[in-house]
């Protein structure tokens, strides 16, 4: 009989009050403790939705920039300030990219994607802050933009309301974008599948 087929007996010694039958059907269970805060868990669950919102806001911001492109008509000698700053274009690029990275991180969580997503959301938050500041200057500088050059008072008020409505909508998009991208750039891990100590 060679040593590979030899069986060595195992003896279990239990105290009198414990019997082996109690432990035969025991199931092992593990308790995990999450290091994520409730806010992190909420954002991790809603990542695809928030990423989609960022992309939609980026597309809408770009669309308003295209609308401003057609405002250089007589009698207006210049573009609105917000168009001259370029915010509808570079802001929309930041919003679309940060939203795309959030969706990518939710689909496949890798350390590189998490880092890139945090960087893009940080840049998007900075872009949203810059956009809020530029839009505030736009309200101040261009509040009489339409009526200051047009002599036809009937069209002046209606177009001014439309122009200010677009600026208010852009301001709303920028504020919401700031509230979406800032937590993702600060809180660290985005996904429930991610080991936070590894990527934070």
From Swiss-Prot:
Keyword terms of this UniProt record: Membrane, Receptor, Transmembrane, Transmembrane helix
Membrane topology (Cytoplasmic): 1-52, 102-120, 181-200
Signal peptide: none
Record membrane topology: Multi-pass membrane protein
Extracellular side: 74-80, 142-159
Membrane spanning stretches: 53-73, 81-101, 121-141, 160-180
One of the record's GO cellular component terms: plasma membrane
Outcome of swapping residue 123 to R: In a colorectal cancer sample; somatic mutation
Compartment(s): Membrane
Tissue: Expressed at high level in the testis. Detected also in the pancreas, heart and in the brain.
InterPro entries given in the database record: CD20-like, MS4A
A biological process term (GO) from this entry: cell surface receptor signaling pathway
Pfam families reported in the protein's UniProt record: CD20
Primary location recorded for the protein, binned into one broad class: membrane
Function statement: May be involved in signal transduction as a component of a multimeric receptor complex.
Assigned protein family: Belongs to the MS4A family.
PANTHER family reported for this sequence: MEMBRANE-SPANNING 4-DOMAINS SUBFAMILY A MEMBER 5 (PTHR23320:SF54), MEMBRANE-SPANNING 4-DOMAINS SUBFAMILY A MS4A -RELATED (PTHR23320)
Record protein name field: Membrane-spanning 4-domains subfamily A member 5
Organism of this sequence: Homo sapiens (Human)
Encoding gene per record: MS4A5
């Amino acid at each position: 009989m060679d040593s590979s087929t030899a069986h060595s007996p195992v003896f279990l010694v239990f105290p009198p009050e414990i019997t082996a039958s109690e432990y035969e059907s025991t199931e092992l269970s593990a308790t995990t403790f999450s290091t994520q805060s409730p806010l992190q868990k909420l954002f991790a669950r809603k990542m695809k939705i928030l990423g989609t919102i960022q992309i939609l806001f980026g597309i809408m911001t770009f669309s308003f920039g295209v609308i401003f492109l057609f405002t250089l008509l007589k009698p207006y000698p210049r573009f609105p300030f917000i168009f001259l700053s370029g915010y509808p274009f570079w802001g929309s690029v930041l919003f679309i990219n940060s939203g795309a990275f959030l969706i990518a991180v939710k689909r496949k969580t890798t350390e590189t994607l998490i880092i890139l997503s945090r960087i893009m959301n940080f840049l998007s938050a900075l872009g949203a802050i810059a956009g809020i500041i530029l839009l505030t200057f736009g309200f101040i500088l261009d509040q009489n933009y339409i009526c200051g050059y047009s002599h036809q008072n009937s069209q002046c008020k209606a177009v001014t309301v439309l122009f200010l409505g677009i600026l208010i909508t852009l301001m709303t998009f920028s504020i919401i974008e700031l509230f979406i991208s800032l937590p993702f750039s600060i809180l660290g891990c985005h996904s429930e599948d991610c080991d936070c100590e590894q990527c934070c």
